[in-house]
Amino acid sequence: MNKFWETGRKIVAVGRNYAQHAKELGNEIPSEPFFFLKPTSSYLLQGTGPIEIPLESSDIHHEVELGIVIGKKGRDIDLKSAMDYVSGYTLALDMTSRDQQSIAKAKSLPWTVSKGYDTFCPISGFIPKDKIKDLNNVELWCSVDGQIKQKGNTNQMIFDVPHLIQYISSIMTLESGDLILTGTPSGVGPVKPGQVIKCGITGLDTDMQFDIILRKRN
């Protein structure tokens, strides 16, 4: 699973899983997990290139997240065995075209466009399962041009990882190499071409850094 981005078939992104993030965007705190899908073509591995800002969007936001890499196929997974299906983790960004998302929300349309552009799921690479000892105490941070914008802990999540796995697998089969993005803490905000975004997990050597550029059409 150390190259899950090459083998996984889907990215399941959980929304509004940190109460303060839900509030900062004016959303209600969910009573059950809420998720959407991102295409695997949106993966951008650390060191392989910049994040591209699409020409048709002027409000791109960073959202740092802990990613859960699924290690084996499962359906209707129960809470007690949920972690048996986890092979490891990744640090990820769920890049979001906020203006495109607002248009979709106003029209009651899916968020696919706002979340699915190429390079909109930057990742650090694979983090072995044993590197994170306490999944309920993982501090994530994100900076833009050296200024910290996001800092939050997984102990602030509304739904923990076993509950997310249980819920998602009750709807769709989770397969080896799939990635679950577990939500973002508060502090999301815009990035622009020419800026540099950096993210990390406190205490782990997982820092990742990406330049931001304006996309050039082929």
UniProtKB/Swiss-Prot annotation:
Predominantly, its location class is mitochondrion
So which domain of life are we looking at?
Eukaryota
**Chain sites annotated for binding Mg(2+):** E63, E65, D94
Any idea which residues the transit peptide spans?
Answer: 1-18
Instruction: Tell me what reaction this enzyme catalyses.
Output: a 3-acylpyruvate + H2O = a carboxylate + pyruvate + H(+); acetylpyruvate + H2O = acetate + pyruvate + H(+); 3-fumarylpyruvate + H2O = fumarate + pyruvate + H(+); oxaloacetate + H(+) = pyruvate + CO2
Q: Does the keyword Transcription apply?
A: no
Compartments in which it is found: Mitochondrion; Cytoplasm, Cytosol
**Necessary cofactors:** Mg(2+); Mn(2+)
A GO molecular-function annotation: acylpyruvate hydrolase activity
Q: What is its EC number?
A: 4.1.1.112, 3.7.1.5
Alphabetized, the UniProt keywords read:
Cytoplasm, Hydrolase, Lyase, Magnesium, Manganese, Metal-binding, Mitochondrion, Transit peptide
Which InterPro entries does the entry mention? Fumarylacetoacetase-like_C (IPR011234), Fumarylacetoacetase_C_sf (IPR036663)
What cellular component terms from Gene Ontology apply here? Answer: cytosol; mitochondrion
Q: Which family does it belong to?
A: Belongs to the FAH family.
What does the subunit comment say?
Homodimer.
State what this protein does.
Mitochondrial protein that acts as an oxaloacetate decarboxylase (ODx), catalyzing the decarboxylation of oxaloacetate (OAA) to pyruvate and CO(2), and as such is likely a regulatory enzyme in the TCA cycle. Also displays acylpyruvase activity, being able to hydrolyze acetylpyruvate and fumarylpyruvate in vitro.
Record's protein name: Oxaloacetate decarboxylase, mitochondrial
Task: Name its species.
Answer: Dictyostelium discoideum
Task: Write the gene name.
Answer: fahd1
